[in-house]
């Protein structure tokens, strides 16, 4: 426990930068009942293009439920989700968003990486797919079956798909699960690439190092309620650190 405390205390945020763009995504009074239980309770937030927002909280806090609701997989919610001032129903949210699950293997369907990058896309841009694979260092594996790739390569494949699929909102569930430190830093760098493309990015994670390396903002959920929402600046790092230290002591 003490070793973890020292290590966490030394990590510094390296992705933080003020985002001066106008918010394009708005969540207003979002609530959701699941099996007669209130699992999301009056959430309100906005996000601008290029933001990388870490979603933190203990198990059962509502992180995954919020993510699935945001991308249209939960439909029985109240409140509003708007994109550029226009309210989105569940079907529209599906069109706007792309979610990468914790185990990427379950959403790799094509028989080659090259085909995976354009899978399910009408009129795909093959040049864009090639450029994405080249940019992410996986072009040499384009003829390989996606499930033969390493964990880090699969994550890069998922990022390549997110670059090609023309979605505005990207949601990642534990993207560094099972990755070593070097691979985690590589994934953090890939998120910076997506940020520069103007994507709105949400990341559900329990990885303190990844939050510090990749995210510009943190939203803390607990029992379906929004507890904190803050920029991940050096001045706010203690808030993130305190959350993880409390979690370790539970």
Describe the residue ranges of each PLM region.
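H-loop/switch region of ABC-family ATPase nucleotide-binding domains
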Residues: 205-206
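Conserved beta-strand-loop-alpha-helix hinge in the C-terminal portion
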Residues: 1-2, 225-248
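Conserved ABC transporter NBD signature motif
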Residues: 79-93
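Helix-to-loop junction immediately C-terminal to a conserved catalytic motif
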Residues: 71
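Conserved ABC ATPase "signature" region
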Residues: 126-141
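Conserved ABC ATPase signature
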Residues: 145-149, 153
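Catalytic Walker B motif of ABC-type/P-loop ATPase nucleotide-binding domains
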Residues: 170-173
């Amino acid at each position: 426990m003490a070793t973890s405390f020292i290590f966490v205390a030394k990590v510094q945020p390296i992705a933080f930068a003020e985002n001066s763009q106008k918010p394009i995504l708005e969540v207003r009074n979002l609530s959701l009942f699941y099996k007669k239980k209130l699992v999301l309770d009056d959430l309100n937030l906005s996000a601008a293009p290029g933001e990388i927002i870490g979603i933190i909280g203990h198990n059962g806090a509502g992180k995954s439920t919020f993510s699935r609701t945001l991308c249209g997989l939960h439909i029985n919610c109240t409140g509003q989700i708007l994109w550029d001032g226009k309210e989105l129903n569940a079907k529209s949210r599906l069109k706007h968003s792309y979610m990468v699950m914790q185990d990427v293997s379950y959403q790799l369907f094509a028989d080659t990486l090259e085909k995976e990058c354009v899978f399910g896309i009408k009129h795909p841009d093959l040049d864009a797919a090639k450029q994405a694979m080249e940019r992410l260092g996986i072009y040499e594996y384009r003829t390989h079956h996606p499930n033969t790739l390493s964990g880090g390569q699969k994550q890069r494949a998922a990022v390549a798909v997110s670059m090609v699929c023309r979605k505005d909102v990207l949601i990642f569930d534990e993207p560094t699960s099972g990755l070593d430190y070097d691979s985690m830093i590589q994934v953090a760098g890939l998120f910076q690439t997506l940020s520069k493309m103007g994507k709105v990015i949400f990341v559900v994670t329990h990885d303190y190092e990844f939050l510090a390396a990749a995210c510009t903002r943190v939203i803390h959920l607990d029992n379906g309620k929004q507890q904190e929402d803050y920029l991940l600046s050096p001045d706010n790092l203690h808030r993130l650190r305190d959350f993880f230290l409390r979690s370790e002591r539970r």
